């Protein structure tokens, strides 16, 4: 009887969160017919300290009139490109507080659930800092032929950043610094605004490893799938040493005989 009287546990609503482009495009700029390029539109909105909250509300209200309610709710995914946050100053590259503030203010003004996508992968290629990062080979991955892949995605630039996690590598240092900064800003939001953020995602994709990605979506052979930069290969060997302890143990467990760790090749088979 007691079990029958116990209320079932409440279930969190199912959130539909489509990625919405142009979140920082404000209504005022779209009404200015002299602004033809997106970067000009965004600069105008930033100067006004405006964003696309009003347009976002209108869009989501067409999908779920009356606001989010019930067991299935419509929200959105907001993408924040971490490297794109940086601006150059006489003291070097610093995070532009205004860019982060604009997105967080949009989240505060739109009473909808949101997934915050902190993007720092190969599609984070449009920021001013990228031109400097390109000059340092340490920031790039390499394929087995010793060269970084050179691909685009339907006109959008793709940059093959290293797969290493070494925080001293410049691209990683900037990415990690931006990640920590955004985390601090989110933590400082009012609780009601924080609770609108139903999830964080760092989702990455492997487009930059696909041969002829735009045309080769169905390819399953000759796929190049890892980072053969010498430093990455050295990381692989150090991992083997931690995992097996000695080359003798490696041979006992795998049947592979090498005189030392430096002789172990990185995986190279399809």
Which ranges hold each PLM region?
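Short acidic/His/Gly/Ser-rich catalytic and metal-binding motifs that mark active-site loops
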Residues: 27, 125-128, 209-212
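Boundary/entry segment of secreted carbohydrate-active catalytic domains
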Residues: 5-80
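Active-site beta-loop-alpha junctions enriched in small/polar residues
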Residues: 19-23, 81-83, 119-123, 202-207
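Polysaccharide-binding and catalytic clefts of secreted carbohydrate-active enzymes
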Residues: 136-270
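Serine/threonine-rich low-complexity intrinsically disordered regions
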Residues: 27, 32, 37, 51-52, ...
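Beta-sheet entry/capping signal
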Residues: 12-14, 73-75, 113-115, 196-201
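Aromatic-lined substrate-binding rim segments of carbohydrate-active enzymes
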Residues: 49-159, 167-190
């Amino acid at each position: 009887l007691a079990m029958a009287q116990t209320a079932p546990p409440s279930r969190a609503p199912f959130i539909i969160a489509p990625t919405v482009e142009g979140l920082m495009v404000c209504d005022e700029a779209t009404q200015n017919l002299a602004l033809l390029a997106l970067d000009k539109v965004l600069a105008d909105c930033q100067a006004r300290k405006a964003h696309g909250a009003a347009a976002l509300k209108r869009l989501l209200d067409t999908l779920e009139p009356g606001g989010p309610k019930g067991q299935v709710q419509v929200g959105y995914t907001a993408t924040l490109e971490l490297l794109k946050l940086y601006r150059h100053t006489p003291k070097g590259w610093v995070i532009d507080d205004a860019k982060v503030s604009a997105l967080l203010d949009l989240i505060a003004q739109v009473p909808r659930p949101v997934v915050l996508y902190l993007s720092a992968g190969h599609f984070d290629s449009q920021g001013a800092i990228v031109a400097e990062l390109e000059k340092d080979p340490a920031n790039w991955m390499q394929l087995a032929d010793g060269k970084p892949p050179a691909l685009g995605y339907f006109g959008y630039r793709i940059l093959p950043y290293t797969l290493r996690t070494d925080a001293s590598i410049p691209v990683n240092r900037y990415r990690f610094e931006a990640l920590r900064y955004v985390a601090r800003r989110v933590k400082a939001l009012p609780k009601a605004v924080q609770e609108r953020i139903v999830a964080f995602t760092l989702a990455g994709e492997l487009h930059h490893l696909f041969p002829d990605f735009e045309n080769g979506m169905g390819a399953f052979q000759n796929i190049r799938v890892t980072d053969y930069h010498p430093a990455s290969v050295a990381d692989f060997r150090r991992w083997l040493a931690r995992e097996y302890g000695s080359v003798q143990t490696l041979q006992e467990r795998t049947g592979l005989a090498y005189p030392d760790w430096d002789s172990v090749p990185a995986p190279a088979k399809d």
